[in-house]
Amino acid sequence: MAKNYTVADVVNIDSDSDSDDDNGGVIGMVPSLASLIENQKVSIADAATVAPRETLECRSFWKAGENFVIPSSVTLTAIGMVEHARVHPKFLHSNATSHKWAFGAIAELLDNAVDEIQNGATVVKIDKINIVKDNTPALVFQDNGGGMDPNGIRKCMSLGYSSKKSNTTIGQYGNGFKTSTMRLGADAMVFSRSTRGGKSTQSIGLLSYTFLRKTGQDDVIVPMIDFDISSDSPQPIIYGSPGDWSTNLNILLKWSPFSTMVELLQQFEDIGTHGTKVIIYNLWLNDEGIYELSFDDDDVDIRLRDENAQDGKRLHAKTLEVRSHISYRYRHSLRAYISMLYLKKFKNFKIILRGVSVAQFNIADEFRHPETIMYKPQAAAVDYAATGIKVGFIKEAPKLPICGFNVYHKNRLIRPFWKVVLEGSTRGNGVMGVLEANFIEPAHDKQDFERSSLFLRLEARLKRITSDYWQNHCHIFGYQTAQIPADKSKRTVIPDQPPTVNTYNPSPLPSDRISHGGPIIREINLSNATSSRTAAVAAPHLRNYTGLRNNFQPVQLNPQPPAAGDTGNNLVGKLAAEIREENLQLFMRCEEYVKKENEVEQTVKSLEKELEEIKSKCAQLALLVDAKKKEMQQV
């Protein structure tokens, strides 16, 4: 049964009266919303009149930034207002495109809740609700942290403001809330309660891309209202005029899922004395016109639609096995992704997804034959502490061809199942690792790391760790590492067979005869096993990084002691060892060069795109300058 809410008469509270210096600093800079809308030449009646909720014509996220009308005339500043640099609403969409993956945006919102653990948060809930106005789904995030006062909610909904200075907090740029909510849906509402300095407040804010697009704004306008709830009935807190507060309220009622003040205030009932609730609605659709996020496939999960799923088709048993592993499931199951999102297990904090708590999972707990290798990053200016790299075989080894490293930063998973070995290689199958790399910086979307020198050194080290671990342990599962014998005296060049190009095209061999060792030995001829073995070793100048060696120099590995006076044995032994070492080095270098080449190509494309955008902006600015000059001449 709904409560009967009564709101006291509007009271005018001067922001300077707050004891917190920061309050005046932020709230004092917020211009009058009514004057902003009037300045945009959009009728307040049109913007705030309560009517059926509107939506964007284009509901696909990747197309929602297209066909945005850029005003051709200069927007004048209202009398008495300070001229300010405008942030066009299109920036909200462009900024959110940093999240290529929708689950990455959800993880950003979870990070905000986890950062609230230091303020007493014990739970964060993620759920789906239905909007009564149009019966569409909405995504809800709710935590019981310290909440936000009027000053805090304005910082949250401002661009690029971050108050997180702790070394343990995940957020740092002050951009995550805007990019993540906009990536998931066109509109977001924030409800927050807090107690600061003995005064209890509750605040409501609306970040609506739909509102900004539909009303033709050329500046990001965020309507917000605040209440003082220290007494029995909530009292509106006014920082401008009563008319401005009413305008904010009317815009909230028109463009939000709630039609009345009672419905708005009901959203605080399950928050308690402190906490925050975020409702994201007008969720994005995919190119097929259906919601990106699926709520119907699993009642206790939120899923991304799997484009590789073959409805009605029987899949190979091995394919089903691979797709049942968490290395595949996390891409489409939010529950699977969240389960390994944080490295250390929480003691007094729960993540509840659609009514069911998420069990944390660390794949290192299931390693077979685990080892811990200490790694100390080397840098010229900073002395970093050593970090432990846990490495081992997954429990499904050797059946599943899965390998890689889960790399965390400040307890948060940044790069899951990072495969550092050459794609398509069987060397390293089943080898997994887990580490926390606080010495490298994550990218803005927290799904990768910045390509620094420390990152490249770590990548090279992880390749070596994978290779060494495989070399030392692959025999456990029946793999063989074919190596040239250490006794150099047993190596002789075949006397009656001059070096020639080997055109042999090997056919697939049974598993017990496949070499899983280093990339040197490619062919073993056992036709004359009683007296000698013939190993084909590629010459250094004929090797390539793909692992295909089409040219060989036959070398005989003679198990019998050489004849006295054979002076060529030591030379051949040294040559083979040098070839093996050189081959490994060239192999790794070529792989790195290919990656660097791809990175350079991506950088060039990005810069070309950025150049085109800058040219377009310059043209628009030129038009604005011309219009301004004409106005000045008329004056």
From Swiss-Prot:
Q: What happens when the gene is disrupted?
A: Loss of ATPase activity. Increased sensitivity to turnip crinkle virus (TCV) leading to spreading hypersensitive response (HR) and impaired control of viral replication and spread. Suppression of HR-like cell death induced by Pseudomonas syringae avrRpt2. Suppression of lesion formation and partial suppression of stunted growth of ssi4 mutant. In the double mutant crt1-2 crh1-1, compromised resistance to avirulent Pseudomonas syringae and Hyaloperonospora arabidopsidis associated with compromised cytosolic calcium accumulation upon infection.
First-level EC class: hydrolase
* Tissue expression summary: Expressed constitutively.
**GO terms of molecular function:** ATP binding; ATP hydrolysis activity; DNA binding; endonuclease activity; RNA binding
Gene3D superfamilies, A to Z: Histidine kinase-like ATPase, C-terminal domain
Needed cofactors, names only, are: Mg(2+); Mn(2+)
Family assignment from sequence similarity:
Belongs to the MORC ATPase protein family.
Q: What is the protein's known function?
A: Mediator of defense signaling triggered by distinct classes of R proteins. Required during hypersensitive response (HR) that confers disease resistance to turnip crinkle virus (TCV). Exhibits ATPase activity. Contributes to resistance against Pseudomonas syringae and Hyaloperonospora arabidopsidis, at early stages prior to cytosolic calcium ions Ca(2+) accumulation. Required for pathogen-associated molecular pattern (PAMP)-triggered immunity (PTI), basal resistance, non-host resistance and systemic acquired resistance (SAR).
| Official protein name in the record | Protein MICRORCHIDIA 1
Q: Name one GO cellular component term.
A: nucleus
**Which residue intervals make up region (Disordered)?**
491-511
Q: Which PANTHER family match?
A: PROTEIN MICRORCHIDIA 1-RELATED, ZINC FINGER CW-TYPE COILED-COIL DOMAIN PROTEIN 3
Q: Which UniProt keywords apply?
A: ATP-binding, Chromatin regulator, Coiled coil, DNA damage, DNA repair, DNA-binding, Endonuclease, Endosome, Hydrolase, Hypersensitive response, Nuclease, Nucleotide-binding, Nucleus, Plant defense, RNA-binding, RNA-mediated gene silencing
Source organism per entry reads Arabidopsis thaliana (Mouse-ear cress)
Q: How is the cofactor bound?
A: Uses preferentially Mn(2+) and, to a lesser extent, Mg(2+) as cofactors.
Coiled-coil spans are: 588-635
GO BP: any one term:
positive regulation of systemic acquired resistance
**Quaternary structure, from the entry:** Homodimer and heterodimer with MORC6. Component of an RNA-directed DNA methylation (RdDM) complex that contains at least MORC6, MORC1/CRT1, MORC2, SWI3D and SUVH9. Binds directly to SUVH2 and SUVH9. Interacts with the resistance proteins RCY1, RPM1, SNC1, RPP8, SSI4 and RPS2. The interactions with various resistance proteins are disrupted when these resistance proteins are activated. Interacts with the PAMP recognition receptor FLS2.
